[in-house]
């Protein structure tokens, strides 16, 4: 035999990416990032602690100053809850129309 049936191949590396959509206020941003990356989150008091820095925007109906208004949205499986103004919504609104993209691509 010429050894055709014995192909030695390297093991394949498979990486699973679990996409999550998170909405938070400026005060909790660092904490959320550290929770998602697995690092300890110790956030010092900052300018967002004063009532005058509060602009009244909250997510999911929370309205008390200092209230944790973070939301964690599942992603990738299609079962997550999406807010009305997300990064993707803004991205898609700013994108050119498909006809423009096709024209640009065909000219290249």
UniProtKB/Swiss-Prot annotation:
Provide the species name: Arabidopsis thaliana (Mouse-ear cress)
- Biological role stated in the UniProt entry: May modulate WRKY transcription factor activities.
Q: Which Gene Ontology cellular-component terms appear in the entry?
A: nucleus
Instruction: Give positions of region: Disordered.
Output: 65-85
How this chain assembles, per its entry, is: Interacts with WRKY25, WRKY26 and WRKY33.
Task: Tell whether Nucleus is among the UniProt keywords.
Answer: yes
Q: What is its main location?
A: nucleus
Q: Its GO biological process terms?
A: response to oxidative stress
Motif (VQ) on chain = 29-38
Q: A Pfam family in this protein?
A: VQ
- Protein name listed in UniProt: VQ motif-containing protein 10
Per the record, where are the segments of Gly residues compositional bias?
A: 73-82
Q: Does the keyword Nucleus apply?
A: yes
**Subcellular location(s) of the protein:** Nucleus
